[in-house]
């Protein structure tokens, strides 16, 4: 095995509470083989629940759709397990990818408007994508506000006198925005991949960094894609706490160049590396944004990595998700 590949088994598990025999629906992303990862030994254990594997048409993803009209009166555990051979990679020519699909705006990734102004003011150009990368890297701060007395305040996260984002907000304003969005279930907050939020407020996670980058890229007429998956820790086996995402942009004749801007912000010594390269410690589950899923009604799904669940057509979070890996 070469140094630039990694092999591991991944288990995606969802424990669903009893629905008191009301209709249960569950949607879970399914990974696919590509030029940079090989998925094998894929298995689904639905614990007796009816399921189909569906194609997401626009971006070519797959997902598991559980539709069990009788629901369940006991808890059920749905598991998908698969082996991954993942490559470290730089630019890649992917077959069957239409770059034109990745030029227009989505609900949380607008194109043009304020992004045109940013491009003009900062002389950004599609001939210098490193400039776009650096602009986002310098403008964003990695972190998640929770509350004023949270650990992030004891452990320097944002400085108390700093100004963040184009709106030059204070740390306390960042936190109150977060609390407000939580109480109103709004999406102008951390972790929704909202480019406007990223640009205005300048504090977020991987979804925010990469959405911001994609808005700027597409505004420059450089196709760019959003990739969502899981980071795989360095050890032999263990839990995976949550998702990770990254992006890539297209150069005619050269293919798609990956970027991982939030990882570069967390590890500044790797900033040069993560412009044009991504490491092997990951698995991709979905590409794109604003997914139409079978049975999910008319609304688009902005981000799809964790389970979506409905009981009698009403959104529910009566489940426990867990993810684990083991090196092969």
Label the predicted regions.
Residues 32, 85-87, 142, 231-234, ...:
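Solvent-exposed loop/turn segments at secondary-structure junctions
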Residues 77-193, 200:
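Acidic low-complexity segments
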Residues 18, 72, 121-128, 198-209, ...:
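Extracytoplasmic/periplasmic, Sec-exported soluble proteins
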Residues 1-90:
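Intrinsically disordered, low-complexity N-terminal segments that are enriched in acidic
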Residues 274-328:
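Low-complexity, Gly/Ser/Thr/Pro-rich intrinsically disordered linker/tail segments
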Residues 19-21, 71-76, 121-127, 218-221, ...:
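A short, structured loop/turn motif at beta-sheet edges
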Residues 26, 80, 132, 166, ...:
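Cysteine-centered nucleophilic/redox motifs
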Residues 208-298:
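Hydrophobic/aromatic-rich core segments of domains that either
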């Amino acid at each position: 095995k070469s140094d630039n590949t990694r092999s591991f088994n991944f288990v995606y598990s969802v424990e669903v509470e009893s629905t008191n025999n009301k209709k249960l629906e569950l949607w879970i992303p399914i990974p696919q083989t590509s030029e940079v990862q090989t998925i094998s030994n894929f298995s689904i254990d639905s614990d007796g629940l009816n399921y189909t594997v569906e194609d997401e048409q626009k971006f070519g993803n797959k997902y598991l759709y559980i539709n069990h009209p009788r629901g369940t009166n006991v808890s059920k555990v749905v598991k998908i397990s698969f082996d991954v051979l993942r490559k470290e990679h730089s630019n890649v020519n992917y077959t069957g990818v239409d770059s034109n699909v990745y030029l227009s705006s989505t609900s949380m990734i607008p194109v043009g408007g304020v992004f045109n102004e940013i491009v003009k003011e900062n002389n950004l150009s599609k001939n210098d994508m490193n400039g776009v990368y650096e602009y986002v890297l310098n403008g964003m701060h990695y972190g998640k506000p929770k509350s004023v007395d949270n650990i992030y305040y004891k452990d320097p996260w944002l400085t108390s006198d700093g100004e963040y984002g184009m709106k030059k907000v204070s740390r306390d304003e960042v936190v109150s925005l977060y609390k407000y969005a939580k109480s109103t279930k709004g999406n102008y907050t951390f972790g929704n991949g909202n480019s406007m939020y990223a640009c205005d407020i300048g504090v977020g996670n991987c979804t925010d960094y990469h959405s911001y980058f994609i808005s700027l890229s597409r505004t420059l007429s450089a196709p760019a894609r959003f990739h969502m998956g899981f980071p795989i820790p360095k050890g032999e086996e263990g839990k995976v706490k949550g998702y990770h995402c990254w992006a890539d942009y297209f150069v005619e004749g050269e293919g798609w160049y990956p970027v991982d801007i939030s990882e570069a912000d967390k590890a500044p010594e790797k900033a040069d590396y993560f412009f044009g390269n991504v490491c092997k410690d990951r698995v991709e589950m979905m590409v794109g944004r604003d997914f139409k899923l079978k049975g999910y009604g008319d609304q688009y799904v902005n981000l799809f990595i964790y389970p979506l669940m409905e009981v009698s057509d009403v959104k529910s979070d009566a489940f426990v998700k867990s993810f684990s890996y083991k090196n092969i």
